Swiss-Prot record:
It comes from the Eukaryota. The gene is esr1. Residues 1-21, 187-229, 478-535 are annotated as: Disordered. The keyword Magnesium does not apply. Highest expression in brain and liver. It is found in: Nucleus. GO terms for molecular function: estradiol binding; hormone binding; nuclear estrogen receptor activity; sequence-specific DNA binding; zinc ion binding. Residues 171-236 are annotated as: Hinge. Residues 1-104 are annotated as: Modulating. A zinc finger (NR C4-type) spans 105-125, 141-165. The steroid hormones and their receptors are involved in the regulation of eukaryotic gene expression and affect cellular proliferation and differentiation in target tissues. Composed of three domains: a modulating N-terminal domain, a DNA-binding domain and a C-terminal ligand-binding domain. Residues 237-473 form the NR LBD domain. This is Estrogen receptor.
Length: 535
């Protein structure tokens, strides 16, 4: 027999076939092999190479077998050189490149160090989020809760940094979607044919962001209606809900209109309607930041906004006026008292109701966390009631809205339970706060009637967004609304919005306008510059 002390090379593979006629050939194993037959990586060695062995023991093969295989093996090695190189690149090199692919932090756009809390993030944001969820996170933004987060300015505002962490989706215990884990495998369950499979959104109440009704993805594993498997239950912690709601609050506005006092009916209503139109723009931007709101269909978003816009504006007015007894702070430069409402017929009654509600909120010592929860509840709860004719469509995905409403209610209950109140006082305070919402709805109905009367008088020009919201609400019967619409078709009611947008389709009585689901009130989501930092 002939002993080969060195591993064979590609060009010398013919020597394996032309070995002496001895019965055995000794081939020593060595880690130094041909590069295309031994690709770097952790995927093992090619199985088609007969002379490769991973063990350190010598390999003895018959020379007869060697003679039969050498020719075919030589041809295979020569012709498949390029294929083996591609295979090596596909297995080892590609994995190496994927492992070293550059990723950036979802919060500050710095280089990401790994997948932390559900998203790619850097070490700084990972440590910051960990400290925030484990300790106190009652951060306050010194500006308008809209600070820029980048590598250089991420430490300037802790409140906006934590808000950005929540906005990108960082959660405690987050895992990569393309990887398993004991938690995910444990939560996955099979929905039986007689159980949740009959309900397309049977597991929706456990989700933070409900899926869109109009464009559901059938391939998504988070929906239980598309297949038999239900995704893992994802819940948003109450602290995260409260933080997102507080970060979504719009900035303080200014009317920027100088009108001589005493006010007349025209000047008073011009000031109030102009201010309401500006607030509506910011209200739409606020609603888009409510957890889960943008996951709803466009129809449901418009429906909720048109049903609750005046209530949302009123509770904001009440909150701004809570520290000024006897005053209503419509803007930083527009503060009115009860006597100034006498110039408009019926306005003094609405002012009295507003001041009484402000006094009640002041007596209850309303907290900022409670205010943002009540405000979101007003928005989401408005879809459960119908104010007008049967022609108004109901919500497409009412179960998703109910799930969002449950999350907001849980956040309110969580805050009250951690506010230091006794066990007996906690449910009492919850009832006291929720009962005030009926008073706000009553004031909203009064205010809507008053706006319709102003529209019928045709003395004060109404802005397009305010007109669209007013006609979309349709508080009165269709006949009265149609009559009001005919009376307001004069040139004095056709103005431009504060944002410069053209009038959108209205759900009013005007037959020439047809509502389009892709346009309307949601196009006014870009706030104007009529704002100032909150002091």
């Amino acid at each position: 027999s002939r002993m080969l002390t060195d591993p064979p090379r590609i060009g010398s593979m013919q020597s394996l076939g032309s070995s002496p006629t001895g019965p055995l050939v000794f081939v020593s194993s060595s880690p130094q092999l041909s590069p295309f037959l031994h690709p770097p990586g952790h995927h093992g060695l090619p199985s088609q190479s007969y002379y490769l062995e991973t063990s350190s023991t010598p390999l003895y093969r018959s020379s007869v077998v060697t003679n039969q295989l050498s020719a075919s093996e030589e041809k295979l090695c020569i012709t498949s050189n390029r294929q083996q190189s591609y295979a090596a690149a596909g297995s080892g090199v590609r994995v190496f490149e994927m492992a070293n692919e550059t990723r950036y932090c979802a919060v500050c756009s710095d280089f990401a160090s790994g997948y932390h809390y559900g998203f790619w993030s850097c070490e700084g944001c990972k440590a910051f989020f960990k400290r925030s969820i484990q300790g106190h996170n009652d951060y306050m933004c010194p500006a308008t809760n809209q600070c820029t987060m980048d590598r250089n300015r991420r430490k300037s505002c802790q409140a906006c940094r934590l808000r950005k962490c929540y906005e990108v989706g960082m959660v405690k215990g987050g895992l990569r979607k393309d990887r398993g884990g004991r938690v995910l495998r444990k939560d996955k369950r099979y929905c039986g044919p007689a159980g949740d499979r009959e309900k397309p959104y049977g597991d929706l109440e456990h989700r933070t962001a409900p899926p869109q009704d109009g464009g559901r993805n059938s391939s998504s594993s988070s929906l239980s209606g598309g297949g038999g498997w239900c995704g893992p239950r994802i819940t948003m912690p109450p602290e995260q809900v409260l933080f997102l709601l507080q970060g979504a609050e719009p900035p303080a506005l200014c009317s920027r209109q100088k009108v001589a006092r005493p006010y007349t009916e025209v000047t008073m209503m011009t000031l109030l309607t102009s201010m309401a139109d500006k607030e509506l723009v910011h209200m739409i931007a606020w609603a888009k930041k409510v957890p889960g709101f943008q996951e709803l269909s466009l129809h449901d978003q418009v429906q909720l906004l048109e049903s609750s816009w005046l209530e949302v504006l009123m509770i904001g007015l009440i909150w701004r006026s809570i520290h000024c007894p006897g005053k209503l702070i419509f803007a930083q430069d527009l503060i009115l008292d009860r006597s100034e409402g006498d110039c408009v017929e019926g306005m003094a009654e609405i002012f009295d109701m507003l001041l009484a509600t402000v006094s009640r909120f002041r007596m209850l010592k309303l907290k900022p966390e409670e205010f943002v929860c009540l405000k979101a509840i007003i928005l989401l709860n408005s879809g459960a009631f119908s104010f007008c004719s049967n022609s108004v469509e109901s919500l497409h995905n009412s179960s998703a809205v109910e799930s969002m409403l449950d999350n907001i209610t849980d956040a309110l209950i969580h805050h009250i339970s951690h506010s230091g109140a006794s066990v007996q006082q906690q449910p009492r305070r919850q009832v006291q706060l929720l009962l005030l919402l009926s008073h706000i709805r009553h004031m909203s109905n009064k205010g809507m009637e008053h706006l319709y009367s102003i529209k019928c008088k045709n003395k004060v020009p109404l802005y397009d967004l305010l007109l669209e919201m007013l006609d979309g609400h349709r508080l009165q019967s269709p006949g009265k609304v149609a009559q009001a619409g005919e009376q307001t078709e004069g040139p004095s009611t056709t103005t431009t919005t504060s944002t410069g947008s053209s009038i959108g389709p209205m759900r009013g009585s005007q037959d020439t306008h047809i509502r389009s689901p892709g346009s309307g009130v949601l196009q006014y989501g870009s706030p104007s510059s009529d704002q100032m930092p909150i002091p």
